[in-house]
Amino acid sequence: MTRHFGILIPSTNTTVEIECRLLPAAYQAHVGRLMTSTPGRTFSPSRDEDIEYQALLLGTAKVELVILAQTSASLFADDYDEVVTRRMSAGAGVPAVTSAQAVGRAVRALGARRIAVVSPYSEAVNERAARYFQSKHGLETVVLQGFGATDSYAIGQLGPENARDAFARIDRPEIEVFVVPGGNFPTMTSIAAWEQEFGKPVVTTNQASFWAMLRAFNTGERIPTFGRLLAEVPAG
C-alpha cells in the first residue's frame, strides 16, 4: 500500500525533493512551494496565503499528513508552530507538523537532552535555534556551530564535509546528539557514516521530517540506511 504525504518548502529549496526520493517507494511525497513573506529578509517565514493555498491543493491529492520543511520559520515567533500547523491542517484536512517540531521531538524520542547545533545559519539565527529547542522541547544546546549562510541558495551549496568537519571540531562527551537544521542542507546520505565515526546520533531536518511521517503512518517500517532515528523509529 502506498502512503502519501505533503511537504511544503520555500520556493528557493533545491534539496528536499531530492532527499524525498531516497525514501522507499511505498512513501510518496507531494510538494508545494512557498514564497517568502518578506523579500530581502534572511530566512523569513513564508506567506500565509501560500501556505493555506498549497495545503488546500495537497488535500485534494488525499495526502495523510502535511509537513512544513522550513525549520528557520519556527524560530521567529513563539507561537509559530501552533499557528502554522492549524493553518495547514485546516487547508489539507489532515494532521500537520513543522520540521522544527519534528527535530525537537526526534531528539527527545532518542532519549537525549543535550545537543550540539551544527547549522548553515548565522550566529543570530543559531541563537534563536538554541532558544527554540530549549523553550519548546527542553533541550540544552551545549555547542552552537554555524556556517553563516545568508540565504537558502548558500545553504544548498554546502556539502556533507562541512557538517562532518564541524562535528570533529566541537565533539565532546556531554553532547548526546548532533542536530543539523536546514531543509536545504544536503545530509541524508551521510548520516549513517557520521554516526559511525562519532558514536552518537545525528538528527537533521529532512530525516526528522521523515521520522515524523513514519510515526504518523504507524506502519512499523524501519529505514536502516539513514541513521539511528529512521533505523529505530522511536516513539516520541
Question: Across the structure, where does each feature detected by a protein language model lie?
Answer:
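Short, well-structured alpha-helical segments in soluble
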Residues: 48-62, 162-175
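Short, acidic/small-residue loops that bind anionic groups at enzyme active sites
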Residues: 85-107, 194-213
